[in-house]
């Protein structure tokens, strides 16, 4: 059954999914699920406890202690685990790499799938941001969007994001990692990064954040 209270935003990193989700939530008053943060949470806990044994990592996760909220200082969406804001720990490249490694494991995807599905009845509606939200996690969503952008633009956005965090970056290396991850994500056997058949594909390369939000609002209200 189609659910008109679920909107999914899929696409690779750096296309503006998180910003769009936040802006739509402001406009619609809906709850946000940033699924990528959940995978980065697993990567962070792996690094913190020096283990790649997912069974051990699972024991560190209290399902009741996972929630998202807006950060008023930088307008980002923060992931909390047991009242600890993980935002500053899960955004570095080492954690992102570990998150990608865990994301291909069926046991990890199955575990996080259940957590993500648990968000569907929270609030007035749900905006789910990820890579397989419209294809796997919420196939019943009425509104499905898939964002794209050039690798150059995505690398530029990531560079700005890292610089804001005080980190030095190499633009060429960033772009190479983006292209490498795209290839891995789109060709993996489990939940490949592809648009849902009924998703609307939008290239965000030349769209401002509010232009993108207005475009999506116009579509869902038409």
Predicted regions: what is each one?
Residues 71, 116-123, 131-140, 166-215:
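Small-molecule kinase domains that catalyze NTP-dependent phosphoryl transfer to phosphate-bearing small molecules
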Residues 7-9:
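Hydrophobic anchor at the beta1->P-loop junction of P-loop NTPases
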Residues 18:
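Walker A/P-loop
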Residues 27-93:
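N-terminal phosphate/diphosphate-binding loop that engages ATP/GTP or pyrophosphate donors
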Residues 12:
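P-loop (Walker A) phosphate-binding loop of NTP-binding proteins
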Residues 87-165:
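ATP-dependent NMP and nucleoside kinases share a basic, alpha-helical "lid"
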Residues 15:
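ATP-binding Walker
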